[in-house]
A protein has these predicted regions:
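Short, contiguous acidic/charged loop-to-helix segments that flank catalytic cores in large enzymes
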Residues: 295-303, 314, 333-335, 357, ...
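Conserved "right-hand" nucleotidyltransferase catalytic core of DNA-directed polymerases
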Residues: 1-8, 16, 21, 99, ...
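Conserved catalytic core of nucleic-acid polymerases
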Residues: 227, 309, 314-317, 395-513, ...
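Active-site-proximal helix-loop-helix substrate-binding element of RNase H-like nuclease domains
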Residues: 13, 17-20, 24-35, 48-154, ...
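Short active-site oxyanion
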Residues: 45-50, 71, 228-231, 352-356
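Short amphipathic alpha-helices in soluble, non-transmembrane regions
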Residues: 530-538
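Metal-dependent catalytic core segments for phosphate chemistry
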Residues: 18-21, 364-397, 466
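Short, conserved secondary-structure transition motifs
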Residues: 80-90, 234-235, 554-565
Length: 565
């Protein structure tokens, strides 16, 4: 049997303790079923295929929690399916007349109901008590899900890609539920320390940028009013830009979407003014304090029982990359960044355990080598493996130093425009254009690859490693899109291979995945072996896709994140 289903509960996953109703639709007969919960669960447990929207992260774990349900059949989550197939849906939504603004780019059932003409009626309820309207609402959700499943099915999408995304979604849900152990006490102490330093800097800046006193006169009586006093606010980008312009004639080179001067710690760090250094530190401290304590995604605000349970959307980008939120663990500063080491030390493991950090070596470079091998029989791969890729780039691009070559190379690899390359290597625009042209002329295999990829991109998509369609917005970003997607798909295969292998280790659990890196909590005695297995699984993932390059990785063992990456 094959069923589409939906449930209504009295709360979210961790708070609900009651399932009000379960509705099933037999997709072979079209029959809608509204049995009692026990009967419905038995049918789902015995089904060959169960289909639902966001069932991996909600419906199934709810039924497992409240009814100890076990499902033997295949699980198909339409949320996972739509995120894979319609990764560029936001662009299309903008072209639909009167499309609800709160649904643009969303993959909710409400949004999909609007797209496929099966509009969801909303009901007023606190979800605490069952009502007949609630059952009708559940039936409606089941119908929307069924029609959405048919839309997905008609696409005839790559089964390999679809299966991979479902496997990754399931293992990442386990990661989220387990959480990353967080040192709350240490985080609070760090926040206090940074706030104290911020107060010192604020006081110093008040002395540098004196209050602006403006005389005021009544327009009615002509009498003098109390002077207006504007106290300098070092956290205000508008105030900072205004004062720098007044004192030094500074003009912004970059602007925000609403036309205001763009100003952050990276821009301030490049200015020659003595106040810029203090302002730069002030901006940076504000950013770190927001990450730790004050911001909407602050770690301390999302800590639960000594752990951070960050959410991961496993396919949020057209390139198949994941995104992170509540809080964003993809933006924890690196150990080389200011206060980065102190921040990473907050993410740790329980006493007696170890953290194993593993990442793929030179991921984007290896993906480039794989695709270039078609045109140069592995010559560039040989340089990457046996020589020094940045020294080679220095020679090919005619740059002055290896450091410049490295900056140019990664900017080029990540899709940087000539303007961006010029900024990164500190060269005039025209010279940067010549350097890029020289690099491509001296590397004909890369030139041919770019031409081939741009030609393929004219149909609107590229074919990924697992036969998925990678949407391309424009030809100049096609190579970067291809390489990013290849890296993302490869890492997803790696996660699946690795998580299968560590099932035999008691208390071993992946706690975070960020791009080409994973962190694994485990017993101290198993740490080294798990690290070796993780690296072996990187190699295995490359072989799975028949890559023309050998892949590897490296691992580190510590008691916190600062020691493993």
């Amino acid at each position: 049997m094959r069923y589409v289903f939906d449930i209504e509960t009295n709360g979210f996953l961790h708070s609900c303790d009651k399932v009000h109703c379960i509705v099933l639709k037999d997709i072979d007969t079209g029959e809608i079923l509204t049995p009692d919960n026990e009967t419905a669960i038995k049918k789902l447990e015995e089904a060959d295929l169960i289909i639902g929207h966001n069932i991996i992260k909600f419906d199934i774990p709810v039924l497992e929690k409240l009814y100890s349900a076990t499902f033997k059949g295949k699980i198909f989550d339409t949320l996972v399916g739509t995120r894979l197939i319609f990764s560029d849906i936001k662009d299309k939504d903008f072209s639909i007349k009167d499309f609800p603004k709160d649904c643009i780019g969303k993959h909710s059932l409400k949004a999909w109901g609007n797209r496929i003409g099966e509009y969801k009626e909303q009901i007023e309820t606190d979800w605490q008590t069952f009502t007949p309207e609630m059952l009708e609402y559940c039936k409606q959700d089941t119908e929307v899900t069924y029609k959405l499943y048919k839309v997905i099915e008609e696409k005839g999408y790559s089964p390999e890609a679809m299966d991979l995304e479902h496997e990754v979604a399931s293992l990442i849900f386990k990661q989220e539920e387990h959480g990353f152990t967080f040192d709350t006490e240490k985080a609070q102490a760090l926040s206090v320390k940074l706030k104290a330093r911020l107060a010192e800097l604020s006081e110093e800046l008040q002395g540098v940028f004196k209050p602006i006193v403006t005389e005021r006169w009544s327009t009615k009586t002509g009498k003098k009013l109390k002077d207006s006093v504007t106290i300098f606010n070092p956290s205000s980008r508008h105030h900072v830009a205004q004062r720098l312009k007044e004192k030094y004639g500074w003009d912004a080179q970059e602007f925000t979407a609403d036309g205001k001067a763009k100003l952050d710690d990276s821009i301030l760090s490049k200015l020659p003014y003595p106040e810029a250094k203090i302002l730069c530190e002030h901006f940076l401290l504000n950013k770190r304090i927001a990450q730790i304590a004050n911001g909407s995604q602050a770690w301390l605000k999302h800590e639960r029982n000594g752990k951070i349970h960050g959410t991961c959307n496993t396919n949020s980008c057209v390139t198949s990359r994941a995104s992170h939120s509540y809080p964003n663990l993809g933006q924890v500063p690196s150990t080389s960044a200011p206060f980065g080491k102190e921040c990473r030390e907050l993410f740790t493991v329980p006493k007696g355990k170890r953290l194993v950090g593993v990442d793929v070596s030179s991921l984007e470079v290896m993906m480039l080598c794989h695709y270039m091998s078609k045109f140069d029989n592995g010559a560039y791969t040989k340089v990457a493996l046996e020589g020094d890729i940045h020294t080679e780039t220095q020679k090919l691009a005619g740059l002055d130093s290896r450091d410049l070559a490295k900056r140019f190379y990664y900017c080029f690899l990540y899709g940087g425009s000539v303007k961006k390359i010029a900024e990164v290597i500190n060269k005039p625009f025209k010279e940067a254009g010549k350097i890029k042209k020289r690099f491509l002329n001296n590397l004909p295999a890369l030139h041919k690859l770019i031409e081939g990829v741009q030609s393929a991109a004219e149909r609107g998509y590229l074919t990924g490693l697992d036969k998925r369609q990678i949407k391309v917005r424009n030809s100049y970003s096609a190579l970067n899109t291809l390489l990013q997607s290849a890296g993302a798909i490869l890492c997803k295969r790696w996660l699946v291979e690795f998580n299968k292998e560590i099932q035999k280790y008691k208390n071993a659990q992946q706690v975070v995945w960020v791009h080409d890196e994973i962190q694994v909590e485990c017993e101290e005695k198993d740490a080294d072996e798990i690290g070796k297995i993780a690296v072996e699984c990187i190699k295995r993932a490359g072989e799975h896709f028949n890559l023309r390059v050998p892949l590897t990785g490296e691992y580190k063992i510590s008691t916190n994140w600062s020691g493993t990456h």
